[in-house]
Design a protein with these regions (language model features):
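Terminal accessory carbohydrate-recognition/targeting modules of carbohydrate-active enzymes
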Residues: 1-166
Length: 166
């Protein structure tokens, strides 16, 4: 706890760390709901393992095996008739597309994992949370600054696959 009343962040990465994929792809975060489900990815939100996913749950109808239900989100900020995809995916070899990690200004995972993006004339905060003992993934966006009207497009990338299969 700092004298000004703010909490000190212990799990925090700044832009120069996040944009360096050699560094940031090795930094992973996992959160559980205390009921068997979890959310796991890298700090730049690039799934590099078959066990990664935003909502991974045991499915009773399949013997309680864990399934990746929500793999990732494609989030696009539309500002001044320009589209900025904040996502990143890794393909065979070291090919990445889109390269939305370059818009991340800050990553913090102390209480609720959050990323702050600077995209065009917009500063956007994204927070993610799993509900305790429920198979629910919560997502909140906060517009911290927007010099002009903007739109936010969110597309879920659903998988529904066993965590051991690709």
């Amino acid at each position: 706890f700092q004298p000004n009343g703010n909490y000190m962040s212990y799990i925090k990465f700044e832009k120069n760390q996040v944009v360096n994929l050699e560094y940031s792809l090795g930094k992973e975060i996992i959160r559980t709901n205390r009921g068997g489900s979890y959310s796991s990815t890298t700090i730049v939100d690039c799934n590099t393992r078959k066990y990664h996913g935003l909502l991974v749950c045991p499915v009773d109808e399949f013997g309680g095996e864990r399934f990746v239900l929500l793999s990732s989100l494609d989030v696009t900020v539309v500002n001044n008739d320009r589209s900025f995809n904040t996502g990143i995916r890794k393909y065979n070899g070291d090919y990445f597309s889109p390269k939305g990690h370059k818009y991340i200004e800050d990553f913090n995972a102390d209480n609720i994992p959050s990323r702050i993006y600077r995209v065009g004339g917009v500063i956007l905060k994204q927070e993610r949370l799993l509900v305790h003992y429920e198979e629910q993934f919560l997502l909140r966006f906060t517009i911290l600054e927007a010099s002009e009207p903007m739109k936010l497009q969110v597309r879920p990338f659903l998988a529904f696959r066993n965590i051991h299969q690709l």
